[in-house]
């Protein structure tokens, strides 16, 4: 069953585009981009989520990330 979001596709796509533009502007290689994005996620969880909920949110995020990874060999 598809998940529904309270955010429009357009809003999500615009944020994604803006974030990608920043990484491209700084010519960030993949490893640096992943490190920065991971640090951003950690910061958001640690500063915006109640301590009792942080582990559950991190686990949910990790599962969502893993399920969205494409297993094809092309890159």
UniProtKB/Swiss-Prot annotation:
> Which family does this protein fall into?
Belongs to the UPF0352 family.
Organism of origin is Citrobacter koseri (strain ATCC BAA-895 / CDC 4225-83 / SGSC4696)
Transmembrane parts of this sequence: none
Record's InterPro entries? UPF0352, YejL_sf
Protein name as catalogued = UPF0352 protein CKO_00587
What's a Pfam family this protein contains?
Answer: DUF1414
């Amino acid at each position: 069953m598809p998940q529904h979001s309270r955010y429009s596709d357009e809003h999500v796509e615009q944020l994604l585009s803006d974030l990608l533009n920043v990484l491209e502007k700084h010519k960030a290689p993949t490893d640096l981009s992943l490190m920065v994005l991971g640090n951003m996620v950690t910061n958001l969880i640690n500063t915006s989520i109640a301590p009792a909920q942080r582990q559950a949110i991190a686990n949910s995020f990790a599962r969502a990330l893993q399920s969205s990874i494409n297993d094809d060999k092309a890159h």
